[in-house]
Amino acid sequence: MAPTKKPQKNKQSKNEIASSLIPNSGHKKPSKAPKLLISPENEDRLRRLLLNFRRTPSPVTATLSVTQKRKKLNNLYENLSCEGFLDNQIELVLSSLRDGATLETALDWLCLNLPSHELPVNFSNGASRFPSTGRSVAVISKSKKDWNVSAESSVQEVKEVPESEVLVRVKSKRDEEEEDSLSSCQPSQADWIHQYMKRLEEEELESSDDERDKVSGPRSFEVIAKEYCVERYNAIKAKRKGDKSGQSQAGLAICKLKEEMNALGPSEAILESEFQRDRQDCEGAREKEVASSVLDDVHESVNADAFFFQLFDDLTLDTNPVGSCKSEEQESVVSNDSLDDLDLGDLFDEDVPPYVPSPHELLELQKKEIMRELCNEKHLTKLNGIWKKGEAQKIPKALLHQLCQRSGWIAPKFNKVTGEGRNFSYTTSVMRKSSGFGKSRQAGGLVTIQLPHQVEDFESIQDAQNRVAAFALHKLFSDLPVHFAITEPYASLVLIWKQEESLGITSREEQRREKFVESLLEADNFSLTTTSRGIHSALPMVDSCVKENDDLDVVKSNHRARRNSSMAAECSSLKQKQENKKKMQKYKDMLKTRAALPISEVKKDILQKLKEKDVLVVCGETGSGKTTQVPQFILDDMIDSGHGGYCNIICTQPRAITVAQRVADERCEPPPGFDNSVVAYQVRHQNARSDKTRLLFCTTGILLRKLVGDTTLKDVTHIIVDEVHERSLMGDFLLIILKSLIEKQSWDNALPKLKVILMSATVDAHQFSRYFGQCPIITAQGRTHPVTTYFLEDIYERTKYLLASDSPAALSSDTSITDKLGSVNVPRGKKNLMLAGWGDSYLVSEDSLNTSYDSIKYIASAVVDYDLLEELICHIDDTCEEGAILVFLPGMSEINMLLNRLAASYRFRGASGDWLLPLHSSIASTEQKKVFLRPPKGIRKVIIATNIAETSITIEDVVYVIDSGKHKENRYNPHKKLSSMVEDWVSKANARQRMGRAGRVKPGHCFSLYTRHRFEKLMRPYQVPEMLRVPLVELCLHIKLLGLGQIKPFLSKALEPPSESAINSAILLLHKVGALEGDEELTPLGHHLAKLPVDLLIGKMLLYGGIFGCLSPILSIAAFLSCCKSPFVYAKDEQNVDRVKLALLSDKLESSSNLNNNDRQSDHLLMVVAYEKWVRILHEQGFKAAESFCESKFLNSSVMRMMRERRVEFGMLLADIGLINLPKGKGRRKENFDVWFSDKTQPFNMYSQEPEVVKAILCAGLCPNIAEGLVNRLTKPAEETQRYAVWHDGKREVHIHRNSINKNCKAFQYPFIVFLEKLETKKVVYLQDTTVVSPFSILLFGGSINVHHQSGSVTIDGWLKLTAPAQTAVLFKELRLTLHSILKDLIRKPEKSGIVHNEVVKSMVHLLIEEGKPQHT
C-alpha cells in the first residue's frame, strides 16, 4: 500500500505564503518558480470588479476571409475542447470574443468569467507537475455542475445531470491527495512517488492477469476458415441430396464456428477477406466457362460467397456489431432457412448487362476495403515485444499498461465517473512525454480520456474500464494495430472507431461544432449585409447632403469674407500704429541703434531672398544682431506693405523669454502678452501671448506641440529656427518636419506658402544649405574687438597660483601624472586618451613651456578648481580696468558653489555682493534682467553663467571672460538605461563663442582654464549632434504622436541620420516599457509619455505615481535617479555612512512619513526619508540647520537642492498634461510648489505613506531592471571578504553593491529586487541602488506577461517565472489591460485628475497594501 500523506490545510498562513516565494538553493538560477498566492477575499473582489468594469476589447486590425475565419474557429474549438472545456463553455467564449478570439484570449476569458468549480482542475488550482517530464497538464474532462467537495465524493452517488447543463468532473479526495503529492515535486517525496507508482502497476498487472486467465487460447484464423468452408460445402451437398439430418449437423457446426470466429476479433474483416478471394475465383470461373464437372465446386463457392456477403452486411450495418450468438436451435433454423432459399439465379446467363453499383454499394465497398487494410497482418510487426500472432489476446487495460510502459509514460490511472443507478463509468488519465521535432512535435502532459457520446453505463467495473482503455488505445496509439491484440468485443469497437475516422463520419460533437461555427459566420455576414444595406439606403439622401454641403460652403464663404474684412482692418491698424511710432523720439533712437548692428547691412538681401525662395540660411557672428533683428525685419516689412494682419511669425529660441522682452523694448511696445503688444513668448510653464500677437518666441517643444493639432501650420507665415548650430535633438527633428512641409507645398499649390529661416552663429552653414536643396546663405559680419586669450599655463604664471596638495582639484599629494600613466598598460600613442581623465598637464611638462608650472602636474582636470577661480577673479578686480566679468561654469550647482565662496569673502561684502549675479535657465526672467544693467561706479559686476550666455544673450559691458571649458550635455548611460546631464569639455566652436563675448564694447581678455594643447589638439571642432549621442526613445514617441509614419524611414531623412542599431534599441525599449505595441502603434501609456519631456523610465514612474496617489515620494525618487551624483558623500570609513543610513530609517521626526517604519530594504525609500527630513529642517530651522544636517548624515547639500528643483520641474510637467492640479494664489516660487507636491492631504498623495504602493510604482519605472534571488544560497564574491546573497538578472549571477543598504541583509522580504544600474568589474557584476519588491508589483507593473494556463505558471519579461493558478494569473493580466483602458480614457479627458479614486486603481492599491503587510506568526 502506498504511503499516506497528511492532508493539507485549506488555508495557508501569510508566513507560509511568504516562505513559498523563496527559491531553492544550489543553482545558478532559480530552478523552481516561486509560488504566488493571494487571499480568496482579494481574488473574489478583484474578479467581481473586473467583470463589472467591462473593459473595451482591443480592435481587431487583421481582416480574414470567410474560409480563414471558419478554419480559425474550428481550430479554436478543437483546442479548447482538448483543454477540457465543455461545448457550451467554448461556444460562450467564442460568441463573446468573435473575431478577436485566439487561444490565449479565449483561455483568459474562460478563467476570468467561469467560476473555479466549472473549470478543468488545472486551470483553477494550477497544474500538477511530474518529476519525469515537468510538462504542463492538458485536461480533457467533464464534471458536475454546482461542484462541491465531499469526503465521500469517491463513492457518493449523484444524480445524472442533463446534457444541456454544464458538466464539470468531480475529483475524489484520494485523487486530490495523489495529485497534490505528484505536484509537489520535492526531493523528499521521491520514494513515496516511486512506491505509489509501483503499487499502481502491480494492481493493473494483477487485474490483467485475472482477465487473461479467463480467456482460452483461440485457434488460428486459417483453421477456422478451412473448417468453415468444409461445413458450408457439407451443408450445400446435404441440401442437394435432401438430407435433412446432414443439413442440421452442418448448421450446428457452422454456428459454433461463427461463435469461435466472433471471439477471435474482427469477424467482419475475416469474412470480407474470404468473400473477396472467393469472388475473384468465381469471376475467373465465369470467364473461362468451366465445365459442368466442376459445377458443384462453383455452386459451393458462389453460395459461400453469398453467405460471407450477407454475414458481413449484418455485422457492418448492425449498431452493435459484436453481440452474443444465438442458441444452437435458433442458429440451425436460420441456417436451414437460408439454405432453402439459396438459389444460383442467372449466374451463368449470357448477355448480362454491366453492373453499376449504387452510392450505397460504393460506400459499402469502401468500408470493406478499409476493413481489409486494417486486418492486414503485415502491421503486426509494430506490436513486437507486446504481442505476436498466435498468442492469446489481452484485455485493453493490460495492453494499455504495457504500451505506456514501453513509451516511458507513467501508468494509466482510471477515475470513476458517478452515474445514475448502480452502473459504472470511468475515464482514464495518462501522463505522456513530448515527442518529435519541428512541425511533427507532439506536446506532452496529462491527458484525460472519456468515451465519446457515452449513453450507457456498464454493470461491471472491468467492462467499464476496458471500454475506456480500448478507446485510449485507439486515441493514443492510432498507428498500432491494437485490435489484433485485444479481446472481443473491444477489438470490434476499435475497428468501428478507426473506420469512422477513415470514412470521415461526422460525430454528433462535430455536427454541433460545424453548426455553431456556421451560425457565427452567418451572424458576421448579416452584420456586414446590414451595414451594406445601410449604405445603399443612404444613397437617396445624397442629394440632400449635397444641398447641405452647399449651404455649408455658403456659410464658410461668408465667414471667410468677414475674416478678410477683419484682417484688412487689422492690417490698416498695424500700419497706422507703425507710422505713429516712427514719429516718437524714443523709437527713432532705437532705430538708429538697430541700424548700427552688422545684420542691418544685409536687411534688403534677406527680404529679397525670402520673396524668391522658401528657405534661407542666415549666418552671423556673435553680436551681429540676427536673433533680435531678423524677426523684426520680416514683421516691419509685412506691416509697411499692408499685410501685417496676416503675419504670423514663430521663432524657436532656447532663451525665448529674454529675447522676447528685448524685442518688445526695441519696438517701444508693452511687455510681451500685454494689450497692444505684437510680441509674445511661450515656454513650458509660461504663456505671454494675446490675440494681437504677430511675433512669437517659443521653445522647439512648444512648436512641436502645435504640430500635433496643426500638421500643416496653415496659419503660420514664417518659421525662424535660431541657434541651429547647437544641433539639439528636437532641433534636428524639427528640421526634418520643415523640410517635408516645404517639399509638400512645392507641388501642392493649395497649401499656404511657408517661409523658413535658419539662423546659425558658426561658419558651418553650408551643411544646412545642402540639406534644403542648396538654399541661399546670407552672412553678416560680427562686431567684435580683439580678444587676448590666456590659457591655463599663462594663468598660473600671471597669478603665481600654487595648487594645494589637499585641494579637491589635486590628483593626490604623492602621485604624479607620470606615475598614473605608468601604472596603466597602454601604448604611448594612447596616452592622450588617458589624459582626458587626468588633465593635460603631463604634455605641458613634456613640452617644457615654462619651468614654473610644477603645480600643473597634479591638476585633476575633471574637477573645477574653485580656489583658482576665486583667486583669478580677485586678480582681475585688482589689476585690470573696469568692465564686467563673465564666468562660464557647467551647471547650477557649480554656480552656487562659487557664489557662496565669493559672498563669504571680504571683497564682495556689502554693495559689491549685490552684483554677484547668477545666470541660468531656471532663474526667473525678472531676475535675469539685472545682468544687462550697469553697476555703480567702483563696483565690478560678476556674472556666473552656464552656456546660456554663450550665444543668444549679449551683455554689452562684459570685458573679461573666465571659461572653465566645461558644459553639461545630455548623454545616454547604457548601464542605467537612462539619459542624464554629463559634464564634458566644450568644442572649439563653443570655446571661440565664449572668447568672443569679451570683445563687445572694447578689446577684451579671456582666461581659459585649460591648456593650449587641449584647445588646439584635443577639443572637437564642433559639438556632436544630440541625435548621435542620446537615446532616441523620446524622439520616436514624438514621431508616433505626430503621425509621421514608420520611425526608421522618417529618421533616415535627418541631417545626420542616427545608426540603425540606435533606432532599433529605442523601438525595442518602447515595446518593453509598453509605449508601443504591434506594428509601432502608440499605446495610451506611450501617448502620455510622449507629452513628458523626460527620460522614458522616469516618465512612466511619474505618470503612475500621480495615478496611484503616491506622487511626493515618487518625485523624490525620480529626482534622485535623474541626478548625476549620489546624494551621499562616502568617507574613508564607509561603516560610518552605513550606520547613518540605518539611523535615517530608524530615527523618527514628528509628523514624518511612516515609510521608514514599514520597510528598510530599499535604497530608494531611504532617499525619500532623507529628503523629507532635510526639507523639513530647511523650512522650520533654516538653511544653516539644513547644512548641518547634511554634514552629520554625509549628504551632499547641493544634490539635495538639485533634487528639490527636479521635484518641482517634474511636478509641473504632470500639471501640464492635466494629471494633477496646481495651487492657486501661491505665486510661482519653487518652495511653494514643493510644499504643494508634498501635501499629504492632496489626492495625488493619498497613498504616499504606503511603502508597498511606492515600491510598486518604482518597479514600474525601473523595469526591466529586475533580479531574482537565490536567498538560501550565500557565496563570497571574488572581490569580497564576506559571504553574501546571490542574485540572478536573467542572464548571469549578480551581487548587491557594497554601498547599497541591502548589502548585508541575510533575509529578504521577497526574493526580487529592482535596481538602477549595474557596475561590472573584471570578475563580478554589482547592482547599485536596490529595492526589494513583491511579486505582486512585478505581475502588475513588470515587463511583458505570458500566462501558461495549463501549467499554472507565469513568465515575466521572457525569463522571470512565478507559479500561480491560471485564474489568479489571468486576474493580474486583466488588471494590466484595465489600467491600459484607464490611461486611454485619460487621453480623452486629461483634466480628469481624480483618477486616483477610480475603483480599479483603488482595488490595485488595496491588493498591494493587504498582501504586503508584515507577516506575523
Swiss-Prot record:
Q: Which residues form the Helicase ATP-binding domain?
A: 607-781
Q: Where is the transit peptide?
A: 1-61
Biased composition of type Basic residues is found at: 1-12
Region Disordered: start-end pairs = 1-37
Task: List, alphabetically, the CDD domains matched.
Answer: DEXHc_RHA-like, SF2_C_RHA
Q: Which cysteines are joined by disulfide bonds?
A: none
Q: Which Gene Ontology MF annotations are present? A: ATP binding; ATP hydrolysis activity; RNA binding; RNA helicase activity
- Where can the motif DEIH box be found? 722-725
The coiled-coil segments of this chain are none
Helicase C-terminal domain sequence ranges: 868-1043
Name its cellular compartments: Plastid, Chloroplast
Which UniProt keywords are present, listed alphabetically? ATP-binding, Chloroplast, Helicase, Hydrolase, Nucleotide-binding, Plastid, RNA-binding, Transit peptide
Positions annotated to bind ATP: 620-627
Task: Return the GO cellular component terms, semicolon-separated.
Answer: chloroplast
Write down the EC number: 3.6.4.13
Q: Which reaction(s) does its UniProt entry say it catalyses?
A: ATP + H2O = ADP + phosphate + H(+)
Under the heading InterPro entries, the entry gives:
DEAD-box_helicase_OB_fold (IPR011709), DEAD/DEAH_box_helicase_dom (IPR011545), HA2_WH (IPR048333), Helicase-assoc_dom (IPR007502), Helicase_ATP-bd (IPR014001), Helicase_C-like (IPR001650), P-loop_NTPase (IPR027417), UBA_DHX29-like (IPR056890)
Could you say which protein family the record assigns here? Belongs to the DExH box helicase family.
Please state what the protein is called: DExH-box ATP-dependent RNA helicase DExH4, chloroplastic
Species of the source: Arabidopsis thaliana (Mouse-ear cress)
